[in-house]
Amino acid sequence: MFITFEGLDGSGKTTVINELLKKLKDNFKFLDYVLTREPGGKDIKESEKIREMILDSDLEFSPITEALLYTTSRRIHIDKVILPALAQNKIVFCDRYYDSFYAYQGYGRNLGMEFTKTLTELAVGKTIPNLTFFFDISPFETRKRRSENNLINDRLELEDLSFHNRVYEGYLEIIKNNKENRFVVVDATKPVNEIVDFIFNYLVKHKDFVKFLK
């Protein structure tokens, strides 16, 4: 089973993912899973080097170059992490996947859905998530959070508010137009423990997820 988590930078998803996995392991000690993320991947030096380039605030790329870097990193990640884990019947939890690409590059960078979908179809093939949790919180609130917590901003996080507004609106459009009904919208303004409980309770009742519980 392939589960992804999406949302703006500062939405709290990475913190929630880590707490969620702790709770799952506490309750289901033999749960077999892989935790990974994009851009980059789990211990994959090639895609991690691309990640460093993409997020380096000292480097500049055209939107198309950036999109090609993301796509290359994604294919490496699929080949070396996602597909092998799924072949071993493990659950894959992934912090960001191609929905981020659509939102950030398609909408944020104004490359459009046709262009980003073409690249995604080439890179991804049939490796589509079974379930995606979207952390819903406004760009204004995420900026406020990052400022209050003195978080270091990478190259994308340094973009102005209009960029992040486009990304947010892009996510909403992607969810609205999704034909696979795989999205679960999470209120990311709630406390971390409430979000963790919500996702945990959703998963343990999900018909595909329960097959992995021991």
UniProtKB/Swiss-Prot annotation:
Biological source species: Mycoplasmopsis synoviae (strain 53)
Protein's recorded name: Thymidylate kinase
Molecular function (Gene Ontology), one example: ATP binding
Coiled coil: none
Catalysis performed (reactions): dTMP + ATP = dTDP + ADP
EC numbers, comma separated: 2.7.4.9
Annotated gene: tmk
Keyword vocabulary terms for this entry: ATP-binding, Kinase, Nucleotide biosynthesis, Nucleotide-binding, Transferase
UniProt family annotation: Belongs to the thymidylate kinase family.
Function comment: Phosphorylation of dTMP to form dTDP in both de novo and salvage pathways of dTTP synthesis.
Residues the record lists as binding ATP: G7, L8, D9, G10, S11, G12, K13, T14
GO cellular component terms listed in the entry, alphabetical order: cytosol
GO term, biological process aspect, one: dTDP biosynthetic process
Name of one Pfam family that matches: Thymidylate_kin
UniProt enzyme class: transferase
